[in-house]
Amino acid sequence: MAVVDSMVSQGIKPGILTYNAVLKGLCRNGKWDKAREVFRAMNECGVAPDVRSFNMLIGGFCRVKEPDEAMKFYKEMRRRGVTPDIVSFSCLIGLFARRGKMDRTAAYLREMREFGLMPDGVIYTMVIGGYCRAGSMLEALRVRDEMVGRGCLPDVVTYNTLLNGLCKERRLSDAEELLTEMRERGVPPDLCTFTTLIHGYCREGNIEKALQLFETMLHERLMPDIVTYNTLIDGMCRQGDLGKANELWDDMHSREIFPNHITYSILIDSHCEKGQVDDAFGFLDEMINKGIVPNIMTYNSIIKGYCRSGNVLKGQQFLQKMRDAKVLPDLITYNTLIHGYVKEEKMHETFNLLNMMENEKVQPDTVTYNMIINGFSVHGNMQEADWVYKKMGARGIEPDRYTYMSMINGHVAAGNSKESFQLHDEMLQKGFAPDDKF
């Protein structure tokens, strides 16, 4: 902007090239207010913005995910009779495809064709990615067929996008066919291709196939990265095979690929699931010593591990460690502890936790209250269950079917027929069906 001001002060009228250079710099540095100011100055000085001027603004606002601003400049471009080019459409199509707004994406694709412009491989891939995100694999594959039909051959990014979509829909046989097609067309799979397929098979619990792909990948001289290892380690842990997960951990280190917070979180959670809290603590200490900051999910896993191993008190004491690390407990933290105390029949502790939640402005949910209500109801402590039920209503939290059935069964067992019928009627009014036995 200073360059433009200096030229104007010397009586030199900046041209379109100067203005475009200034716009480019401002957009690259995210100075959007200044960019708008320069755009206005161009008009005031009688310099008509061209397609490049508009593209810089449209592209810039697309990058910072401001669709309204991007569309505003596109409409201004059309109003002034400036013909959009493939860059203009690429920006807008990419923006809406990334957001899964496929009606808008298709509209800009049609408009592009009306100007006699044909999509290139990048645009086709963005559209395919949009349909995959929206869960419309039929449309994604249709666009792929159209792309090939127009002589625009998919590259590795296009194939990886389709593979990811198919794996998300658990269509692994179709994904395998696509991998074969990819090879037949002379497009070599890359690290992303294999990691996507490995993730798909791990989600299905087919660890054997995931490991086969891992071996194929190594045979093809593709070096795995931390994402590949995290995917496999997570797959092993989900199958309960911590031994194999530890082997992968060792293999990873032997290749000088080092764990990140995701790796540690997976292993901490898995050891806690098995009640191996000491092992989980070993990973937590190592993680902290390496300067990797645990997040709320990591801490919640440790608390869950204590609760599962019947040591809720230690889990609650661990809250202080969280706070010392500037990590505040959330709803999952408190629900885990409440569930643990209900299992141990220490119901008075659940009240303490409710008070702590209130003090820390953590809003309990239906699950929180259901656990406490059920804990009191199964032991016939209906006075306390009623108090919690009323507290739930006072906080604006709606009971669900489980809430009503816990309360009704508790009152029936206590011989309180009046209360149980009142709750039964209220339950029906809310649209919940009672148990057949009631």
Model-predicted segments: where are they?
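N-terminal targeting peptides
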Residues: 1-20, 29-37, 41-44, 48, ...
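Pentatricopeptide repeat
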Residues: 15-20, 24, 35, 50-55, ...
